[in-house]
Amino acid sequence: MTRSVAHMMATGSLGAVFLVVTMDHADGQTRTTARPTLGRIERLDPRLDSIVAPDAKMEIIGNGFDWTEGPLWVKADGGQLLFSDIPPNRILSWQQGRGTQIYLEQSGYLGPIPRPNNIAPDEPGSNALALDPQGRLVLCQHGNRQVARMDAPLSKPKAKYIPIADRYEGKRLNSPNDLVYSKDGSLYFTDPPYGLTRKMEDPDKQLDFQGVYRVGKDGQVALLTKELSRPNGIAFSPDQKTLYVANSDAARAIWMAYDVKPDGTIANGRVFFDATSWVGPEKKGLPDGMKVDTQGHLFATGPGGVHVFDKDAKHLGTFVTGEATSNCAFGEDGSTLFITADMYVLRLRLKVKGTGF
């Protein structure tokens, strides 16, 4: 979701900030430090206790950014978290004991910023990040209006890109937002208008819809659905028989579920959960990025924070951040959830593991 939309939804935030003791490991040394924390955990079902401990806190591991998105855990070289900061057009990295550093400039747009005639704040940078089956960095690029692969090793990042998807039936995509790979190597992604300088009114908008797409191993871009007004976050169930898609529209703030057919297309679209009634000044944000654990729980960012659902759409609880919350990702040993929430990057220890670990 775009930062400007998120900030229109509400003002104010949770003021309580606590301290939690953590263990940092740097240069072989172990030391105890205190980290500030943010928000609270709202428990709506006793089953949430098997997912997150009663005393768990959301640690602030980074702050002061413009609009964070697209967290991705990279296991190589001791492990690091990559995440996008969209308005300044960059990716940052975080490592335990090292903190946050700039990883890549011009991550979503190779031209000058701010772009002319933009509706402030301009959001030209990368959004969601992923690793392809070969372990290469793949980016949803707002300004370049494409899904692209970085043409450089992860250890030596460069603003050099190879397009994977930039057009559909000869027309330029809007601004790819989120993506996920299937087990067979196919790429699924969403394409709302948030990265366009004038959003829906942009004169350079060539498609008259916002789509969900699949790129098969043959490289062809196939439209899966154009029924959603603002398709955004996207994730698979553990068995990849269900595809979840968030719709970041205040008038229809929903998460959809689709059956995935053997040929990779989708069918039987239905509303998984409707959060439209949550939208308002008390809860910042809209349905956005999401991830799934190995037990099938859906961790879906949306109004108020990160909402935890079981596979039957039962709402178990919410990690209430008090900020517009854009995305999340599992990392470290798989039982840590990293959360991007406006200017913050948060870390929450869980009792479950995400898929892929």
Predicted regions and their residues:
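Sequence-structural signature of mature extracellular/luminal beta-sheet repeat domains
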Residues: 29-357
